[in-house]
Amino acid sequence: MTMNDLERYIEAHIAPEDELLRELDRETHLSVVQPRMLSGHMQGRLLEMLVRMLAPKRILEIGTFTGYSAICMARGLPVGGELHTIEVDDELEAIAARYFARSGLGDRIFAHIGSALDLAPALGLFDLIFIDGDKREYPDYYRTVSYTHLT
């Protein structure tokens, strides 16, 4: 089985991408320098499923980008759950904020702009942490949040 075969199989067996996420994907590809960094439909569905299965009350996402994965994870949150997402690039803030508001999940998504290494320590404990920021910073992100920020 090739990767293309696997992707076709997955696409055939998951719910189609909804209009909001399709629009976010399109806008990201039209207006952002590195659109390939978008999590996308398959990854988004996987993240939403994991959140539904684990039922975390608090999620930390490092690396908002344009907000696709944050919306997917927020959709899976239990009642009263919240997602904190950190993005270092303030130029992406407007796109993410607009789609967070349109998603109807704006009251569950808390966006923070700045360095995750600086901001995460003040955000408290989390049940789930999704690291998807600057790949060179992964070891530092992991050290910053893995032992002191997981419940």
Q: Model regions: which residues?
A:
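A short SAM/SAH-binding and catalytic strip from SAM-dependent methyltransferases
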Residues: L128-E137
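N-terminal auxiliary segments of SAM/dcSAM-dependent transferases
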Residues: M1-E17
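A short, conserved alpha-helix within the catalytic core of class I
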Residues: R136-T144
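A short acidic, Gly/Pro-enriched loop at the edge of an enzyme's catalytic core
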Residues: P121-L128
